[in-house]
Amino acid sequence: MSAPQDISQNKALLWFMAAACGLCAGANYYSQPLIHSIQQYFAVTESKAALTVTFAQVSYALGLLFIVPIGDVANKTKFIPLLMTLCAMGLFLSAFSVNLPMLWVGTVLVGLFSVAAQVLIPLATMTVQPEKTGEVVGFLMSGLLVGILLSTSLAGLFSNLFHWKVIYVLSGVLMLILAYALKSRLPYVMRMKMDYGQIFVSMAQLLKQEKRLLLRALAGGFAFAAVSILYSTIALLLSSAHHLPDLVIGMVSLVGIFGALSTQYIGR
C-alpha cells in the first residue's frame, strides 16, 4: 500500500482539522459560564447545575482513556467522523433537554465522543514529514486550545442574545458539517498490528520506561486541573456574588487566548 499523503502542504485540510479539534474540545466547556442559567431554567440547586461541568470533565477523561486507544486499531478515516457524529448527537440531546438528567446524558455523550480531536492529532503526525511534525501539531493544538477558550465566550454571548441552548444547536450543526467534510478528505493510514488490550499494556510499559514522559504528563495534568478548577468555580462566584451575566463570565476565558495562539510557533 502506498504511503499516506503529506498533509502539511494541504492548508485547507489543516484548517478543517484545526477547526474540528477546536469544536470537539470546546464542546465540553459550554456549560461552564451557563451554570446560573441552567439552574434557573430547570429550577434546581446551584450544586446540581454545577454537576453538569463535572459530568463533562469525567466523561471526557473516560473517553481519553478508553475511546482514544480504539483509534490505534481502527480505520481513523472512518472513526473520526463517527466520533464527531456521535458527539453531535450528544449536543442535540443537550439542546433539546427537558430536564437536568437529560442534559447530563447529553453532556456525557459529548464528553465521551469529543475525543475525536485526540485521534486527529496523532493522525496528523503520521501523515507529515518528520521535520514538519512540530509545526503541524502546534497548529492543531492552537485550534484545540482556542476552541476551548472561545467556547465559553460564545456560550455566554449566545445565552445573553438568545438562549443558553442555542450554542448546543449551532455546535451540533457545525460538528456534522465538519464530520462530513473530513470524511472524504482525511488520508488513510495503516492500523497498528495489536489488539485493544495490548495498547494498555504498551502504555503502561511506556510510562515505566520513559520517566520524563510520566513527569511531563503529570505536570500537564496538574496544570490543566488547576485551570479547570479556576474556570469551573469562577462562574459560580461571578453569577451569585457579583450578579454578572453569562456573557461577562464567558469573556474571562479570553485572557488565555494569546498563550493558545503561541503554541503553533512554539512547535516550530
Predicted features and spans:
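Extracytoplasmic
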Residues: F16-E46, L64-I67, A117, L230-A235
